[in-house]
């Protein structure tokens, strides 16, 4: 990316900061993380959670969801204007799990949103600290990415379910700002645009009037975000055309689907950050760690070090495998749902198995499940090595890939071949280069066809020992390229239903 100079780093996006040097960025990210930790400790006190209960990931998620709900201005306004029976728009809550007489019990709690906002602001030096809220949203998004597949959503917008590696961040709310946009995959943004265009086709007034003007601005902004993720001139030129269209319709939808497919080989830049559950930050703050003074980075060694010495528990359903539950949460913590399993496994120091072979469902527990039958176990979130998270798609080459997911979106900046099944991807392009963008389409297809098998991505980049904090001695792993590398291969993951 030659244009690096014009971009803010993700940490700056994350903290809403202007240009800062590395030390300032580390300090402001640290301030954000410390605020989340202080908030979590205060909530545990208010809810009278024991130390053990405070380390339960399900409790962490409930507390996180409560603060997100308390600050969701739009929804709060909507709820007040459209009162629904039995819902108090001023309150938020969820299940809290407590250990009573050797058994887990579920307790549904309700809290004033105003009270939660007060605790949050108090933990964040009186500020709204939107960066911290976005950080929590990204953690939830990463957890969804590792837990569910989005086949139905892909099919509904006319995309191919095998394009799931492009769907990072597909459950992130619109209000997640620049930091949220940075972690969204090409397919996610293409899908948001397709939905807008479809509404415009069905509703004559969608682009008209004062509202329509705002809609148009949002449309063009989203086009620019997607354009910025592409790394080739032809893909970007095609995005310009989609953006400039007077009256977006089926031609634009076709172009977007074409571009999304092309990203399976000509990968887009998608940021990856390790966002951990609030209880992990709470534990560190409680043990006296000063995040702001020490500084923190979401893309370096810090999250790995934090997870090395945090003990987090999870409720386990009777037929679930605790090791598999740990893998799911580990992948979510490092935003590695679409990473090559061989790379993840090498870094983690344990075999990482595809989603279809995991004996575990999601982390959250439905209100109709019987909690008393459940046990809790420690999540194994430690790693053998650490690696720098990437914000680029890496260059491409050809490898055997799978029947389910046919490409990867790298998370870790580690030298490897990037697998994709050229025959499968290219089959989708046959005979579809009609229309006004034909020359760009031809150019993109030509680039895809000439993507070389032997090109290594992230040349010379490796993983590091956990003692190597300054990343001085890269270890470049060698991978067995005959093994399956896709997580959603031949998959039976549950669908994400909001």
Swiss-Prot record:
State the organism of origin: Influenza A virus (strain A/Swine/Ontario/2/1981 H1N1)
Family designation: Belongs to the influenza viruses nucleoprotein family.
Q: What is the lineage of its organism?
A: Viruses, Riboviria, Orthornavirae, Negarnaviricota, Polyploviricotina
Q: Where is this motif: Bipartite nuclear localization signal?
A: 198-216
Job of this protein: Encapsidates the negative strand viral RNA, protecting it from nucleases. The encapsidated genomic RNA is termed the ribonucleoprotein (RNP) and serves as template for transcription and replication. The RNP needs to be localized in the host nucleus to start an infectious cycle, but is too large to diffuse through the nuclear pore complex. NP comprises at least 2 nuclear localization signals that are responsible for the active RNP import into the nucleus through cellular importin alpha/beta pathway.
Q: Which UniProt keywords apply?
A: Capsid protein, Helical capsid protein, Host nucleus, Host-virus interaction, Ribonucleoprotein, RNA-binding, Viral nucleoprotein, Viral penetration into host nucleus, Virion, Virus entry into host cell
Organism domain of life? Viruses
- State the oligomer form and interacting partners: Homomultimerizes to form the nucleocapsid. May bind host exportin-1/XPO1. Binds to viral genomic RNA. Protein-RNA contacts are mediated by a combination of electrostatic interactions between positively charged residues and the phosphate backbone and planar interactions between aromatic side chains and bases.
For the region Disordered, what residue ranges are annotated?
1-22
Basic and acidic residues biased stretches: 8-22
Protein name as annotated: Nucleoprotein
Q: Name one GO biological process term.
A: symbiont entry into host cell
Chain location of the short sequence motif Unconventional nuclear localization signal per the record: 1-18
GO cellular component terms, A-Z:
helical viral capsid; host cell; host cell nucleus; ribonucleoprotein complex; viral nucleocapsid
Family annotation (InterPro entries): Flu_NP (IPR002141)
PTM per Swiss-Prot/TrEMBL: Late in virus-infected cells, may be cleaved from a 56-kDa protein to a 53-kDa protein by a cellular caspase. This cleavage might be a marker for the onset of apoptosis in infected cells or have a specific function in virus host interaction.
Q: According to its UniProt record, where is this protein located? A: Virion; Host nucleus
Question: Annotated Gene Ontology MF terms?
Answer: RNA binding; structural molecule activity
